[in-house]
C-alpha cells in the first residue's frame, strides 16, 4: 500500500525515469517533467518493491501542490536519491556468468573493481540500477559518466536501449550513424505494442571522457 505523511517520507525514495519526448509524449501527460537534452525526466517515489514489481507514486502537479514543493526542489532531491538505487556497469559476458552461477549483479559491477579495461578487449557495457528498473537515468549523473570514461579510457557513445538500461560503447572504432541505425533496428525488432512503453530512444548520445558533456552524437 502506498502510504506516506509528508514529503520527508518520500524524499529518500525518489527516483527518475527518462523518456524521449518524441517517442513517448503520451507517457508524460499529467506528470511533472524536466527536459534535459534529448530526454524528458519524470519523477516517482518507490514506496515498496516486490516480486510483482515496484510500488511507485508518480509526481503530478496535484501531488506537488499537496506536498507544497517546487520542481527545483524535487529535481535536486531526486538526483541525489536516484544514486541510492546502486548504479551497475557490467559486460554481457559477466552477466551471462552470473546467471549460470546464480551470483548477484553487484558481484560483477565494474564500478566496484576500480580497473581500466584494455583497449583490445573493450566490449559493449550495460549501465543500469541494482534492481534493473528505470536504470537509464544513471546516465544523467556526471559522476557516473566520469567513472565510465575512466573505465573505458576515453570518450564513449551511449545507446539508449530502454528506460531500464543504456549500452555503452567506446567512441574509437565506431560511427554514430551506424550506431543510430543499429538502435532503430533493434527497437523495431525487440519491442511490440505490449512493451513499447519501455522504449527509450533511437538518438545515440556522445559523452566526453570526463563526463562533462553529454549530447546527441553527430551522424558522420
Model-identified regions with their sequence ranges:
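C-terminal structured domains
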Residues: 128-220
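Conserved catalytic core of nucleic-acid polymerases
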Residues: 110-133
Amino acid at each position: 500500500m502506498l502510504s506516506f505523511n509528508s514529503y520527508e517520507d518520500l524524499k529518500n525514495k525518489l527516483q527518475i525515469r527518462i523518456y524521449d519526448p518524441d517517442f513517448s509524449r503520451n507517457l508524460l501527460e499529467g506528470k511533472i517533467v524536466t527536459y534535459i537534452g534529448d530526454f524528458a525526466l519524470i519523477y516517482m517515489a518507490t514506496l515498496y518493491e516486490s516480486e510483482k514489481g515496484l510500488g511507485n507514486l508518480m509526481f503530478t502537479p496535484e501531488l506537488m501542490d499537496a506536498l507544497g514543493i517546487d520542481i527545483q526542489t524535487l529535481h535536486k532531491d531526486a538526483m541525489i536519491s536516484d544514486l541510492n538505487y546502486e548504479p551497475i556497469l557490467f559486460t554481457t559476458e559477466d552477466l551471462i556468468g552470473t546467471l549460470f552461477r546464480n551470483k548477484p549483479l553487484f558481484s560483477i559491477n565494474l564500478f566496484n573493481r576500480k580497473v581500466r579495461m584494455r583497449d583490445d578487449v573493450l566490449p559493449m557495457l550495460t549501465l543500469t540500477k541494482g534492481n534493473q528498473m528505470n536504470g537509464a537515468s544513471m546516465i544523467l549523473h556526471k559522476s557516473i559518466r566520469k567513472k565510465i570514461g575512466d573505465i573505458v579510457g576515453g570518450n564513449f557513445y551511449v545507446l539508449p536501449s530502454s528506460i531500464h538500461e543504456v549500452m555503452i560503447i567506446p567512441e574509437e572504432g565506431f560511427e554514430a550513424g551506424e550506431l543510430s541505425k543499429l538502435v532503430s533496428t533493434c527497437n523495431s525488432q525487440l519491442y511490440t505494442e505490449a512493451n513499447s512503453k519501455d522504449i527509450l530512444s533511437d538518438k545515440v548520445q556522445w559523452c566526453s571522457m570526463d563526463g562533462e558533456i553529454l549530447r546527441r552524437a553527430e551522424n558522420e
